[in-house]
Amino acid sequence: MYPLLETINSPADLRRLPRAQLKALADELRAFVLDSVSKTGGHLSSNLGTVELTVALHYVFNTPEDRLVWDVGHQTYPHKILTGRRDRMGSLRQFGGLSGFPRRDESPYDTFGTAHSSTSISAALGMALAAHQQGEDRHAVAIIGDGAMSAGMAFEALNNAGVHDDCKLLVVLNDNDMSISPPVGALNRYLAQLMSGRFYASAKNVGKQVLRVAPPLLELAKRLEAHAKGMVVPATLFENFGFNYIGPIDGHDLESLIPTLENIKHLKGPQFLHVVTKKGQGYKLAEADPVAYHGPGKFDPAMGLQKSSAPAKRTFTQVFGQWLCDMAEQDKRLVGITPAMREGSGMVEFHKRFPGRYHDVGIAEQHAVTFAAGMACEGLKPVVAIYSTFLQRGYDQLIHDVALQNLPVVFALDRAGLVGADGATHAGAYDIPFLRCIPNMSVACPADENECRKLLSSAFEQNHPVAVRYPRGAGAGVEPEPGLQPLPFGKGEIRREGSGVAILAFGTLLYPALQAAEKLGVTVVNMRWAKPLDTELLLKVAASHEALVTLEEGAIMGGAGSAVGEALQAAGLGKPLLQLGLKDEFIEHGDPAKLLALQGLDAAGIEAAVMARFGSVLQPEKSGKPAKPALKSVA
């Protein structure tokens, strides 16, 4: 089925192929990617768009000696297939299987781990300068998309790289006019002008002449260097950064890509190659709707994505999106902000209904946070919809620009906790620890969809910054009540009365805690707020129970359990305390339910942990053991 591809077990095999066979190989590679992703789920559109570019890079450069650094990394399936992992693609994004992103511990061809955007140029520059310092003759190539190029970090790296005339650095701009959502901002308009301007047609023709009427390589390299500015718009933005800019060229045309890359290898100083690709290339359904096919689940390629006949549970993202529209209808001060995650964060409907109050700032989390702060200074009520893992990138702005000035910005933190197939790079494991230590900041942890809507309303009515964290996907299936009624600020509730031990649940783990409690006979408290902690309720529960257990889908170290321990200590209460949450480790990709079970955070794991630590204080009929004297404090 894949006669050429099955002969390629490494890029060395690829480089032994005659150039005339590369087009056929690319076709097989694209078909293999489509077949693989349709069976496992994963990123599709971006990978179909990078097939020829991947083939060309591995064909021209001596990988892994020459370093390829893939920005974001979700477009690396062709790269993985060509670098000896073809037979493992059936395990993609599954527990114990291939990662959906580059990982240094997975292959020597994955020279730098990526998953968050805009890091590739910095890493590749570091590699290029390290090679130069150590006297090693190798290239470093950063492959970055036009969406990722909009981030400040990419421009910081360009600014630094442009002064190093002695490094062998190539930046390949993969211009597919898409990030996850369509890219926005002045840079995108600038690239569009390069593509559509009157100069482009003649530039492209000059480029073809230089490439096809080819003298010997050394002479051609000199001509390319001399004529580079004649191939594109003069004094481009990237040339002003100190790069030699070449392009745009067709990123699906191997006859253009390979000679261009071969010639660039002989040029001195930092090089910038602008290639134009199409997301979903070669699969008509993905070409027509690259957003829908950005990260599909399993599907039949012949039929395409199909809507499920079974009614789907409402996701937390959808609950947020509906709340945002409803609150915007009621309060004209509300503005919605997203760093390039309109679809992922549930803001499509808000954008349609309130276009003048919707702001997609691009992949620019630092800017998004301070932009929101500026709006709050002028009396608006900004809501920043952002994944928990991406808020990490705007941490200084969170402290310096929002919290220090005590500005009323709401942070809707999607993908809090484990995220499943995307793995450690996307896990929202750290938001409670890094948020609760900031003065003026509050953190809400809804247990279900109804609480999510109400706690968003609670957050919105505050005059200081508040984050509401909620997980990916659906929850317990509790239908949100209509209206915009808030829950009391900083207050929890007792959900189940028991004895001996009380489980203090923060967020959606309330429901497995309730399941475990039915067998254990213990009390369950829905804490709702990691900050401010409901200390009144906490001390009341502590006084009437012999031991406490905290439960959170987040890092144990510094998390909500730590907050409970601090509060008990401040009150002078020595109370046995068991903290359950995510362990001090990076948690691999896999099925979310399996990952929670492995962390001991499903109902069975919670029951086992409580029994192991506090079985002696449970009712004899629950523990299966004779009653024992009360525990002494270990706090």
Curated annotation (Swiss-Prot):
Its cofactor is Mg(2+); thiamine diphosphate. One of its GO terms (cellular component) is cytosol. Thiamine diphosphate binds at H74, A115, H116, S117, G147, A148, N176, Y283, E365. Keywords: Isoprene biosynthesis, Magnesium, Metal-binding, Thiamine biosynthesis, Thiamine pyrophosphate, Transferase. Binds 1 Mg(2+) ion per subunit. GO terms for molecular function: 1-deoxy-D-xylulose-5-phosphate synthase activity; magnesium ion binding; thiamine pyrophosphate binding. Pathway: Metabolic intermediate biosynthesis; 1-deoxy-D-xylulose 5-phosphate biosynthesis; 1-deoxy-D-xylulose 5-phosphate from D-glyceraldehyde 3-phosphate and pyruvate: step 1/1. Its EC number is 2.2.1.7. Mg(2+) binds at D146, N176. GO terms for biological process: 1-deoxy-D-xylulose 5-phosphate biosynthetic process; isopentenyl diphosphate biosynthetic process, methylerythritol 4-phosphate pathway; terpenoid biosynthetic process; thiamine biosynthetic process. It catalyses: D-glyceraldehyde 3-phosphate + pyruvate + H(+) = 1-deoxy-D-xylulose 5-phosphate + CO2. Homodimer. Catalyzes the acyloin condensation reaction between C atoms 2 and 3 of pyruvate and glyceraldehyde 3-phosphate to yield 1-deoxy-D-xylulose-5-phosphate (DXP). Belongs to the transketolase family. DXPS subfamily. PANTHER family: 1-D-DEOXYXYLULOSE 5-PHOSPHATE SYNTHASE-RELATED, 1-DEOXY-D-XYLULOSE-5-PHOSPHATE SYNTHASE, CHLOROPLASTIC. This is 1-deoxy-D-xylulose-5-phosphate synthase.
